Amino acid sequence: MKEIRQFTSESVSEGHPDKVADQISDVILDAILAQDRRARVACETLVKTGMVLVAGEITTQAHIDYEQIIRETITEIGYNHSEIGFDGATCAVVNAIGKQSSDIAQGVDRELEEDQGAGDQGMMFGYASDETDVLMPAPITYAHRLVQRQAEIRRNGELPWLRPDAKSQVTLLYEDDVPVAIDAIVLSTQHSPEISQATLREAVIETIIKPVLPADWFAHCRSENIHVNPTGNFIIGGPMGDCGLTGRKIIVDTYGGMARHGGGAFSGKDPSKVDRSAAYAGRYVAKNLVAAGLAERCEVQISYAIGVAEPTSVSVNTFGTGRIAESRLVELIQAHFDLRPVGLLQMLDLIRPIYRKTAAYGHFGREEPEFTWEQTDKAEALRDAAGLGPATAEIINVRSERH
């Protein structure tokens, strides 16, 4: 008898107040890294009606016009008029940025680059699953694609009443851990006052939802389980509706709850912070193990001590789907991936201004050039080292059928 279960993940758009904050923090990081590769950045942002506050610790030789960068980012997101409730041209900008503590710096900055220590203690998780073509869990993948589609339709003017703030949620049905159908959808989008709820619902379903979701999965979803703006009007949104903070959407940023999370946020942190770089490396490791056919699902945990270069632990969980022992997978990881802080930077080419794009629609499952941690360039070597030989036609065919 098949085991049936549900799993739900959510995402939010670039205009959600927490994501506005994340993008501002990462735009500042990018601007600094473009001038100073050795900068240390920990930038936090708060947005609320009529104001932006940036704070944190930044040590750099770069010369940055913080106010201009912040205003441009808000305007690009779509908050460009007081009628929307937030305007990048007129909001107040408060700067409370200081410098990195010398106590932290002495553990991170070393004479020899290879001795660079971790910027903090902590544990980070990476995850991959063969249930989608990007080796990500299906619920978060389609939750992201819904709000990405909302932004695309808003920007191209196809539905001119759309506004920047939006949220999505997708519930999938699984049979024996394989996704087979969509059971429920929530899509809430900010809108201008003149649109009726009936018109909005029909347009959102036809223009945003149906083009994104697999038709065979969507066919199983009952109409009463498609929730479009279920509370009615969503006119007041963005920072006017809610206070936004950097780092408050860490599950949206990662695996939608399908994998564990070490607790550290990403945005606004330069890659010397293992909260960010080791989480990216964890995804890189897990994705390559799954791409190599060594497991169908894989979760990798890496941990560090502040000021220490080598990880304090590396562990793997394949949830019973591994082709070889998990202890052997750990050996392969240690042989094929340099998980020291300097190794993370070099392996994934992280000291670049690439982070604005990561700050909305997820840090993983994005196969664009900036997302080096999504490459599967080590899969063949891992498979050979495991003694499994080249990928079979059977494996290739199964993967080609993923949604």
UniProtKB/Swiss-Prot annotation:
Cellular-component GO terms for this entry: cytoplasm
Signal peptide span: none
CDD domains: S-AdoMet_synt
Molecular-function annotations in GO: ATP binding; magnesium ion binding; methionine adenosyltransferase activity
Binding site for Mg(2+): 18
Tagged with keyword Metal-binding: yes
Positions that bind L-methionine: 57, 100, 242, 273
Cofactor note: Binds 2 divalent ions per subunit. Binds 1 potassium ion per subunit.
Binding site for K(+): 44
Pathway: Amino-acid biosynthesis; S-adenosyl-L-methionine biosynthesis; S-adenosyl-L-methionine from L-methionine: step 1/1
Flexible loop as annotated region, ranges: 100-110
GO biological process: one-carbon metabolic process; S-adenosylmethionine biosynthetic process
Binding site for ATP: 16, 165-167, 242, 248-249, 265, 269
Reaction equation(s) it catalyzes: L-methionine + ATP + H2O = S-adenosyl-L-methionine + phosphate + diphosphate
Role: Catalyzes the formation of S-adenosylmethionine (AdoMet) from methionine and ATP. The overall synthetic reaction is composed of two sequential steps, AdoMet formation and the subsequent tripolyphosphate hydrolysis which occurs prior to release of AdoMet from the enzyme.
Similarity comment: family membership: Belongs to the AdoMet synthase family.
Self-association state and partner proteins as the record states: Homotetramer; dimer of dimers.
The protein's name: S-adenosylmethionine synthase
Record lineage: Bacteria, Pseudomonadati, Pseudomonadota, Gammaproteobacteria, Chromatiales
